Amino acid sequence: MEKTLHKVGVGLGWDPNANGGENFDLDASAFMLGKNKKTPADKFFVFYNNPVSQDGAVSSSGDDRTGGNSADGDDETLTVNLDGVAPSIEEIVFIASIYEAEKRRQNFGQVRNAYIRIYNAETNEEIARYDLEEDFSIETVVEFGRLYRRNNEWRFEAMGIGSKNGLESLVAKYMN
């Protein structure tokens, strides 16, 4: 990742359910982790019920419950001000998940044009992108990638780890 990067965005996009039935409610979230690979406090987990991190460095555009916020662009966005991240945070893991996927019997393979991407928020240059519909067709949650500190600069690593166990499994993994 370029050294001069100060602000990144994580965009999640998808099309509304055109086939009837339950809406597809995809969510973008972030776990801000300390040295022990856990969130130091609950407010370092940014999601629909906590739209701004404790340090104010990560914020959410809000919860789009249908995929109808944009015609072809991002429906939900996380914005990260890298210069404002608390010194105790060593990495930020970005997640795409389907709300109540098990109850609604949904997975990414059913959601048309679903993607998650990370980009330089100052230039809009895309750094990485996953097509959720194809790459994670049977999953309900994806650990997309992580920003991590190395020698006082932020770097990005794609992860691409999908699961059928929902966001709850990652809350158990990353929360103290």
Could you tell me what each predicted segment is?
Residues 1-176:
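Intrinsic-disorder/low-complexity signal
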